[in-house]
Amino acid sequence: MSEPANERTGFHRVLLKLGGEMFGGGKVGLDPDVVTKVAEQIAEVVRSGVQVAVVIGGGNFFRGAELQQRGLDRARSDYMGMLGTVMNCLALQDFLEKEGIDSRVQTAITMGQVAEPYIPLRAQRHLEKGRVVIFGAGMGMPYFSTDTTAAQRALEIGAEVVLMAKAVDGVFTADPNLDPTATMYAQITHREVIEQGLKVADATAFSLCMDNEMPIMVFNLLTEGNIARAVSGEKIGTLVKS
């Protein structure tokens, strides 16, 4: 059985995972209105003194697993997806700067003209100086999702929680779009998510967080102000913890 919801507290350093599909507004490419709203919410949180790192997917440009089904080599299609994440990172950086928020993009694949290489200690120094650090190009290796990247980066930079922003309100007993009787968990363990096969993120990400006692908060990005609510510890979405 899942545990009852406990009192939640605010966080000081967070890793925000954003799905690339949402950056496209459900289409291929970038939706400036969506990116603007995300940047505004992140800026509000940073101004309150919270340190924010971000991992963005690339699903609005390429999805490696889907390209593989159409005949492309899986490793090569994954690299294409990594490049898509970098485009999203640069877009978010630009909109954050328009909000007056200093930011840095760090990529797992070296591309010195547009971003810094991924260096964990440098990322932590940026965070301590109030800069948003945006991680691009996934893990830099095929077969690893950006959800797994978010879990790994959160652990390496010493984040207190992974804030997993989705297009749904939290973790449900079943897909709420297909099953009208599905109910949302207020709190659940990593193991329960994995054992029940709940399709929130890939099992590797949840397993990594479970092994290292990293909590995950799943919430709806499309609700205005939810990033700030999640950071402050309000009872929104689903808290996944051991």
Curated annotation (Swiss-Prot):
Enzyme Commission numbers on file: 2.7.4.22
For this UniProt record, the keywords arranged alphabetically read as follows:
ATP-binding, Cytoplasm, Kinase, Nucleotide-binding, Pyrimidine biosynthesis, Transferase
Q: Which residues bind UMP?
A: 58, 78, 139-146
Localization (cell): Cytoplasm
The GO molecular function terms of this record are: ATP binding; UMP kinase activity
Among its keywords, does the record have Cytoplasm? Answer: yes
Classify the source by domain of life.
Bacteria
Asked if the keyword Nucleotide-binding belongs to this entry, the reply reads: yes
State the reactions this protein catalyses: UMP + ATP = UDP + ADP
Record entry for activity regulation: Inhibited by UTP.
Detail which positions bind ATP: 17-20, 59, 63, 172, 175
Q: Name one GO biological process term.
A: UDP biosynthetic process
Which InterPro entries does this chain map to?
Answer: AceGlu_kinase-like_sf (IPR036393), Asp/Glu/Uridylate_kinase (IPR001048), Uridylate_kinase (IPR011817), Uridylate_kinase_bac (IPR015963)
Catalytic class of the enzyme: transferase
Query: What pathway is this protein a component of?
Result: Pyrimidine metabolism; CTP biosynthesis via de novo pathway; UDP from UMP (UMPK route): step 1/1
- Give me the Gene Ontology terms describing cellular component: cytoplasm
Where the protein is mainly located, per its record?
A: cytoplasm
Subunit (UniProt): Homohexamer.
What family is this protein classified in? Belongs to the UMP kinase family.
> What's this protein's name?
Uridylate kinase
User: Which species is this UniProt entry from?
Assistant: Rhodococcus jostii (strain RHA1)
